[in-house]
Amino acid sequence: MNHPVSGALSDVGTGLGARDRTANRGPSHVRSDTTLERIHTVVVHDHDDIARLVAQRIAALIKGKNADGQTAVLGLATGSTPIGVYRELIRLHREEGLSFANVVTFNLDEYYPMAPDNMHSYHRFMWENLFSHVDVKPENVHVPRGD
């Protein structure tokens, strides 16, 4: 049984203006609401929907920065939560030509001591789940080393 998934999605740091937020609402069954606390909340049917929505927002940021001749800078996470987002970004790269050539990425953590090629390394996780599938330049990838 699928349960609705909700989470706070912020436009802070995405570079999306009001016009962009209107144009990129994502799947039609997404419900968007601003509570009394003014925290923008999005409720979707399942994790695949939220992964697509987040990936669409990241893609819009990348495309907008590319159009302005700027570099898109992404802070990325590891673990099971972002895997669906990374899969959708890979699909957008392969099927729709989303380019990561002008993207710089940062991850915040790594185990210590941990060699980058260790099966538990966040460095390895990012290369296996995103970087090796898109055209990001290796020199633009910043994952702390634990060795």
Task: Tell where the protein language model's regions lie, with residue ranges.
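Glycine-rich N-terminal segment of FAD-binding domains in flavoprotein oxidoreductases
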Residues: 63-95
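A short glycine/serine-rich beta->alpha loop
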Residues: 43-44, 74, 111-116
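Ligand-binding beta-strand-loop-alpha-helix segment within the catalytic cores
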Residues: 31-38, 98-147
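Generic structural signal for well-ordered alpha-helical scaffold segments
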Residues: 55-63, 90, 94, 127-131
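N-terminal glycine-/serine-/threonine-rich phosphate-binding loop
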Residues: 2-4, 9, 20-73
